[in-house]
Amino acid sequence: MGVAKYTKWGLQLRRAFHGGFKLVDIEAREPVKCACESEVASYNGALPPDCRLDTSIPLPSKPPAYSKHVLLVSPRADAWVADWQSKLELNPHWPYNAVSTFKRALRTAYRGDGILVNAVCFQGSTLLPKLRHGHAQFLVLPEFQVYDVYQDSIEEFAYFIGGGKGKEAPSRLGFLDYAEGSGNQAARREQGPGCAAAGPIFQGQPFNRNLLLVCGHLQRDARCGLIAPELVDALKGEPYLAETEIGIVSHIGGHKLAGNLIYYSRADPSHVDKPLVDALWFGKVLPAMIPTLVDALSQKKIVSANYRGGISF
């Protein structure tokens, strides 16, 4: 974990982001402070004594070290309420039982470490293709590609994302080869018959919008489950986010820091093969804070009081 792994994956904990975001101190106005205090009191009144919000807890200085984020798309927008068990891996029902198969295969994949795996419930997305029977949909970041995967192909898909099976160099083209574009594929094929296979194993479809994830893993922690829908409502009311997809995501760490958000910003959509993406992590976000937080983002500013760290891909 930490700097060594970021270096290994060619990533950095960035101070200079692709999109030009700058960290700023913004003092909340008095009405916002009062609204936040009221929200905390209301939430804590509905939460068990051992599971209450503590706004005095300091935020961590960096997000988890990861190179890729794979999101299993839940079939329904409200699936986070009843279908997400405390640990998704223990859910025996399709499509959530794909999580345990996928994560187990990643353990033996060539580049299987450093991949976050979560479920997501999109709140009214129009970008996703129609789900076919017996298939699951995965959104892969930072490439912003959606994959439609048959239930018997989950393990093979994990090896595709993870660069092949085993710790030896893969003998066929994997996900990174296709994410890097046709020129890279041609170069790999020229290395010899043992280095490539003809054609992709899985074909993704582009997901051409920024993405804002709100942690709402209700059965894992009541705090996130209570705050998430109100955060989503507040975010939907922001004009700046009209072209941003909003989703409720399973556990992303730090329930004591609820509400937790991740903002994936495509800095330059013209990079079709490999988008330049900034991932900004936020914590202790309350609905009353959303206008201030989003207004800052619209000006390429990051509110320091809620910032958990960021990565440039």
UniProtKB/Swiss-Prot annotation:
Signal peptide: none annotated. One of its GO terms (biological process) is protein-containing complex assembly. It comes from Eremothecium gossypii (strain ATCC 10895 / CBS 109.51 / FGSC 9923 / NRRL Y-1056). This is Altered inheritance of mitochondria protein 32. CDD domains: TRX_Fd_Sucrase. SUPFAM superfamilies: Thioredoxin-like (SSF52833). InterPro entries: Aim32/Apd1-like, Thioredoxin-like_sf. It holds the Pfam family Suc_Fer-like. PANTHER family: ACTIN PATCHES DISTAL PROTEIN 1, ALTERED INHERITANCE OF MITOCHONDRIA PROTEIN 32. The lineage of its organism: Eukaryota, Fungi, Dikarya, Ascomycota, Saccharomycotina. One of its GO terms (cellular component) is mitochondrial intermembrane space. Belongs to the AIM32 family.
